[in-house]
């Protein structure tokens, strides 16, 4: 099982960028390999937050369509996930709050692989980032 981060659909629907083709290649490889892809509710919130912040609300729906179209499930955020994220933030000083929440959801669901271009995950042990 692989958790798909928000930057994957955002590169897919965004303007020309070197990661646009990389994101497409990663998804195609995972899907053709029969991998189970999931995301979490925080990823959907990140998409909303980012596009509102850069005044591109019209990009929210295409990004949602891109990710919902490839994942098998959107995992919820539970209280225990937030508590796990808090603990990770106190232990790993370079970890962002959003990344800590994804890591907590991954731990909750025994997921060790993450599709993301965010190098912030690299400092956390036990996570294999696919980029």
UniProtKB/Swiss-Prot annotation:
Quote the record's binding site residues for Mg(2+). Answer: 5, 99
Is Hydrolase one of the keywords? Answer: yes
The alphabetical list of record keywords is: Hydrolase, Magnesium, Metal-binding, Nuclease, Secreted, Toxin-antitoxin system
Task: Return the CDD domains for the record.
Answer: PIN_VapC-like
Give the record's family classification. Answer: Belongs to the PINc/VapC protein family.
UniProt-listed HAMAP family: VapC_Nob1 (MF_00265)
**Name of this protein:** Ribonuclease VapC13
